[in-house]
Amino acid sequence: LQTAREMAGQTGAHACVLTFDPHPSRVVPTGADYVEMIYPPELRAAKFAANGIECIFFKSFDRDFAALTPDEFAEFLKKKFPNLRGIVTGGNFLFGRKAAGNAQTLAQICRENGWKYAAVDGVESGGGRVSSTRLRGLLCAGDMAEYARLAGENYAAYGEVVGGKKLGRTIGFPTLNLPWSPQCKPPYGVYAVRLVDSKGKAFDGVANYGVEPSVGGLVEPLLETHLFATPNFGEGEKIKVEFLKFLRPEKKFPNLEPLTAQIKADCDEAKSVLSGK
């Protein structure tokens, strides 16, 4: 993104991003599992904007688009973006039917059309390339600290607080409930978290993400956050919940007594984790 911003400044253009939805793996069979996106389109757009990108274009990726040759893709760019000044991609960029085009192909297309081109090498850290694939693996493993180190920010859930069963309130641990089912899910379980409200105020807490096996179970997963300080908001509040550390997997308890004892232990552990942040 920095290279794109710099190129835009050099050419008097706007820094824009062209991205696809759904992910091409959901349209073009590869024999592998679908790629699960870390964030939905609206959050990706917000993150691009926060990093200085002025325009975000979402292109619907379908079979017709997947069938374009590299030259046909170039024609698409010329028609869609008649004032295009330059393109920035990763060095391992592939495009066109059956991935027929690569960074070298695109560089030639850019030369033929008078566009600038830059292929940016991937960043290496911790003995490997920083990539969305690597970040997804860290999320699935519950390694929130390494994810944050590589991504430059904590992984977070976003949404609006909804009403719940209010069971937590009866055992001394009221929660703020967020229905949340991203494509790329972290493990079900308990996390030390930091909740940020719509005004930007942060609250430390502990959260359970899962399907409530101890109290009847849920069809869709729920993120239930207990805050260590009483918030002045409730249902309807737009919040962000940052995952700081995975504490333990979700488990089923025979009754409320051991569940309550475990929640207290989880709170103590989360406070210990958060005090070191």
Q: Residue spans of the language-model regions?
A:
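Residue-level signal for inorganic ion chemistry
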Residues: 48, 87, 147, 193, ...
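Phosphate/ribose-recognition catalytic cores of enzymes acting on nucleotide-derived substrates
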Residues: 1, 164-277
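ATP-dependent adenylation/pyrophosphate-handling site
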Residues: 2-32
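A structural preference for short, hydrophobic beta-strand core positions in alpha/beta folds
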Residues: 17, 58, 119-120
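Residues at the starts of beta-strands that form the adenosine-phosphate
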Residues: 14-16, 85, 116
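N-terminal Rossmann-like or analogous alpha/beta NTP/dinucleotide-binding catalytic cores
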Residues: 22-113
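Glycine-rich, Lys/Arg-enriched anion-binding loops that position phosphate/diphosphate groups
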Residues: 110-211
